[in-house]
């Protein structure tokens, strides 16, 4: 089993979970800052946005998780802020981040569609890296299986939880996000292939589809009325993405992302 603490300096402990999230963030910001000027948004605007959005997204992700696990946290109030032990919901972070983005664009008089198009691929790669924090914390895993011989030994060992090997759903989602990132990065280079806003719509449809399937394999998901909450949200993302693309294609005068 991998020690969840990467470094320890006196009373200060740095967890792998935090390092995975921060590594994903750094790469995401770098990619977004390089792309932003092509759409008339300065790199400084990306950095300023992240300084506001990232801490709020972490808080939003934690609040989302705690709300749907309130039956546990009402008895363990001291653990509500213990995010180093895991327990942040990606959808909570995404919803919070999107709201902050809209407010930021309104305040700075920026085009939110352009901002979302720039952010979407970066979010994908950040999520792909961040999921490895779940791996080290032994969370976000799937049902018990007899063996995982198709995986490297270090993954097999870490996925041996409560006396059984577990489906590495973290790995599936990480790979799915990485594949989506590669596809959209290649696609957006082609002139007149994507309208403004369709990169973001692709993210909604791609991520929503993958998450909808992968959530069905998990055993530790938050539930509501017998269905996993993330599956409700995933279905909603797919619907929003499809409606957005259909309406966008019917509108006249919409510019292409890459002319």
UniProtKB/Swiss-Prot annotation:
Cellular component terms per the entry's GO annotation: plasma membrane
EC number: 2.5.1.145
Keyword Membrane assigned: yes
A Pfam family: LGT
Bilayer disposition of the protein: Multi-pass membrane protein
TM regions (residue ranges): 12-32, 41-61, 80-100, 109-129, 167-187, 194-214, 226-246
Residues that hold a 1,2-diacyl-sn-glycero-3-phospho-(1'-sn-glycerol) according to the record: 131
Pathway it works in: Protein modification; lipoprotein biosynthesis (diacylglyceryl transfer)
Presence of the UniProt keyword Chloroplast in the record: no
GO molecular-function terms, A-Z: phosphatidylglycerol-prolipoprotein diacylglyceryl transferase activity
UniProt main location, coarse: membrane
Disulfide bonds: none
Keyword entries, A-Z: Cell membrane, Membrane, Transferase, Transmembrane, Transmembrane helix
Top-level taxonomic group: Bacteria
Alphabetical GO biological process terms: lipoprotein biosynthetic process
Cell compartments where the protein resides: Cell membrane
InterPro entries, sorted: Lgt
Function summary: Catalyzes the transfer of the diacylglyceryl group from phosphatidylglycerol to the sulfhydryl group of the N-terminal cysteine of a prolipoprotein, the first step in the formation of mature lipoproteins.
Family according to the record: Belongs to the Lgt family.
NCBIfam families, sorted: lgt
Name used for this protein in its record: Phosphatidylglycerol--prolipoprotein diacylglyceryl transferase
